[in-house]
Amino acid sequence: MDNLEVKATETESVAEDRVIQARGVWHRPNVTGEETNLEGICSVLDTLQKTGVNLVFLETFYHGMTVYRSSLIPYYTGFDKFDYSPYPDYLSAFVAEATKRGIEVHAWVEDFYIGVDENYFTKYLSQWLMLTKDGAIRQSEGQEYGGYLFLDPANPEVRQYLVNFYHELLTKFPDIAGLNLDYIRYPVSSRYDDTGYTEVAMNGFAEEKGFAFPENATREEKVAMVAERYNDWVNYRAGRVTAFVGQVYDMVRTQHAGVLLSTAVFPEQGKSFGDKKQDFNTWLARGYLDIITPMAYYDDIGSLKNALEGMLPGLSACYCYAGISPTYHNLSNERVLQQMQTTKDTGADGFVFFGSQSILNAPGYIELLEQQFQQETAPALLPHADVQKLIEATAANVEKMLTQAGEPAEKVQSLLQQLQTLSADADDRDVQKMQQVQKQLRLLVRYNLGNFVTEDNLELAKEPLEQLLRYISVKADRLANKTDPGEETPEPDVPATQPEQQPTEPQQTQPADPKPANLARTLGLGAAIAAVAATCAACIHAIRKGRKKK
């Protein structure tokens, strides 16, 4: 790691005047090796807290296993040997201790990817596995590890089983505030190394497109008939992923009101749709997502800026917490701060570091982030916090800035009175009240602010109020959508088949990191490909210790 001695004063603090901001991290349980007991969990959380983190996407379903004692999914290999007393398991301990520290926890779940080793699903539910064009369960993606294993998104039983698992998870852990869907896609593939050719998928596709396979058709004949309709086949598979997102949304909306649904996606819609069958624009249009976490894993600032600016115009009813990876790629302190600042400058509502190990294992980065946020009198609020808290925090910040700028006291108090009136009228649960507050704040910011602030300080007051308007507008639009969800999730699903064998801990040991840093393949920009490929080559030894997420 270079340039770890850069002083915080050499780069403007990204925390300046930002009292509302998501500062998140994706965290794999025990990624540093110290979370084998409660003391280790507390140590990790204390470090994250002092680096300004207010949101943790905690890896909860990965390699086909989980980190709590579920009735549907096996407990992760080795965790039964750890003692988290007085808590019964890792997840119980982490969520409780994070909540004590004011850190919000969302469950990060890897929907269809189930690892590289034989496991519970391959042993007891092999009929649910994704098949390539040639009928293999090993995908071309992840060939360096023998090929990834995926569940089949086109299988209604797969989708329902996962929905049932997420319902169990959210029921057992009411303090988990959100569900972050990762691997919400098919394996990376193209026309020439295609995948998804299960009997369920091919039969469903034929039915949807209105053609029939010949009686006694062989698998090869069915594959050929499907493959010759390639564009429709891409659309069909993307539709199955969208159906799953809709099912999860419906479950959360009807049974876990208040839980936030988010997805980790690549920012390039064209490649995401064609290569991964990931149609996030439709998810946004249907109002499924409360938060989107675009994985903008670029090293250079220009590419990061372009990626975020390309997405943000379509996110009027969805928070954007931008995924960045400067610490994972061992970038300089200056570049880390630049990336954090770029997320703010482009209009993102916050940032999420991938991944926690690249901070927890680097004292220089810990010191850098601690310096950035040490002057704060209180941790930053999350943009999706209660509306009264958002208004109160904004009012206090505006008062501080205007007073320091010499704004007359009577002007400041007049503006604060306007904000207090808005706070009294707001209610996160009442769509009409939220829309009225949205309207009044818009009038104040866009047309009437000059009545309460002198011209010299107009822009100073306007920036935090515009941010507040953004957060309240998302809330109002989300609330309206959940009150009247519009288009229903397509196609009904059947109850999941329950295997005869209940989940037990697999005997195989999963690698610490079965996933390669595959940014060069997925980012899709020529210049970025070369740069990222070089970074990946340099990091290849470290990958097994700190997984590069999809």
What positions do the PLM features span?
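Polysaccharide-binding and catalytic clefts of secreted carbohydrate-active enzymes
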Residues: 133-282, 286
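C-terminal low-complexity, Ser/Thr- and acidic/Pro-rich disordered "stalk" regions positioned immediately N-terminal
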Residues: 485-520
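Substrate-binding cleft of secreted/luminal carbohydrate-active enzymes
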Residues: 288-304, 311, 321-414, 418-420, ...
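The substrate-binding groove and active-site-proximal loops of carbohydrate-active enzymes
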Residues: 26-35, 73-87, 145-160, 229-241, ...
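Aromatic-lined carbohydrate-binding/catalytic grooves of carbohydrate-active enzymes
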Residues: 51-87
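Catalytic domains of carbohydrate-active enzymes, especially glycoside hydrolases
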Residues: 40-66, 174, 289
